[in-house]
Amino acid sequence: VRFHSVGGWGAITTGKNLGAIIGDLNDLLYDRDKVVDEFGNPKEIIHVSANPKYGSEKKGAPTSYFMIAAPERIRVNCDLRHVNVVLCCDPKAFTHTNPLDGMSEGGCLVWESEEEGEAAWERLPLWARKQIIDKNIRVFTLPGFKIAREATDRGDLQLRMQGNAFLGGFFSVSPMLQDFRITPEQFRDAVHKQYVKKFGKLGEAVVNSNMEVMTKGFELVREINVGAIEAPDRPTLRGKALVPMAMAEGLAASEGCGTG
């Protein structure tokens, strides 16, 4: 799993919570199934490792978070080039990086956007559409900021809570809960336990708000149909093309600069 976000938006905290919750689900599976290793010790059914990446400037700068959840221990702890899931919390990510880099065939991209269907597909740049089609990547949109705005009036908390929507989105698009026969109640209990541990000192209202954002993220993630690569090109956050003043006025390239 790879996160793409911005410093100050809480993605690192979300990534840590995600790893801790999966660890708690592993404990739940042991308590339920009593699986032991060859030495009779509790067996790790889901191995988790994770690490963040961000610059010294941190706030406002692009950040990444990498996490592995696997049935066998993977003895590396580094930036991941090959991933199955990308949680793209940064709606501008396609303007400064390639969130699809290293995605596996049939992987899942969850992207911050309030749009769905054809409208969302037309927001993706042409080069990204080609990679999505070539690799048969499933694309989901999630209105994380809208969900966070509805949960709190505080602007700083809206930014930091957005990542919780993507935590819910991850479990919604991942087959993990179904594969391990984890019920919705067991899942919510594991998340609530982690949120109490992480945010409990801030009060019950903060825990409940984060639970609300996570739950709506789980429910509101939407898969978009992959359209044609030739669909209208309407990427967001890209201004109109500008031309030099001389060209706009019909002057020769050498005119208008350094004359007189």
Residue map of PLM features:
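Active-site cofactor/cluster-binding pocket
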Residues: 1-259
